[in-house]
């Protein structure tokens, strides 16, 4: 096995919650990987605009798995997209909005714009913080393009709503995506990684990946070398034998040994 691509979740993995910028070390590591012919893949629920800004110094060395696999970008071009059936996306959005007890706000993701149904609970500030393109809407039918992901932001945390929404929307890969987010999509990170590997002729066994949450499982389950973060939930730490406090530690050793 020779590693040909390294994928990493962003929020909670490469970028600890609350931070806005990556450490300089990861940029140097990505450049060195690129020199050795190894591709780096940010794999995130974020949109392309946000990810490209975050990785601006090394963006040309990366392939971007955006919207949890809903959209894939390489060389500033969309090379794959997995939209949701329109009627289902609107149904899910309405359900997340009406059944979150007034405590949830809904985001519908297009190819490169986030469409926000907000209640002033903090979602807008978070979207502005990470640098997404966005537009305020009042109904899902107002989204003027294909929808790749529907999410609910729960400002008091997901704990009280996980059982309410995740089983109900299992057909749309409903999963907890962080302390405040639950996502639905017809893609997932595993589908996105498979799409990249097929397009670029990379074997899944030759991929290393890092994640910290349940929406990373589809990716971690299919790659040759999966790593889970030390701060992940106990069931995830038990599922994967390779643990790390941060991807940079693993990449530092990888570059020394290869």
Regions found by a protein language model. Give the residues of each.
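Conserved acidic, metal-coordinating active-site core of Asp-based
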Residues: 99-210, 216-219, 231
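Short active-site oxyanion
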Residues: 37-41, 60-62, 148-150, 205-207, ...
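Mg2+-dependent phosphoryl-transfer enzymes with acidic/Ser/Thr/Gly-rich catalytic loops
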Residues: 1-5, 23, 182-258
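Short hydrophobic/aromatic-enriched beta-strand-loop microsegments
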Residues: 61-67, 82, 126-128, 174-175, ...
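Hydrophobic packing residues within well-ordered alpha-helices of enzyme cores
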Residues: 51-55, 162, 219-220, 236
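Short, structured coil segments at secondary-structure junctions
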Residues: 57-60, 68, 167-170, 222-223, ...
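Active-site phosphate-binding/coordination module
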Residues: 21-122
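Asp-based phosphoryl-transfer active-site loop
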Residues: 4-19, 220
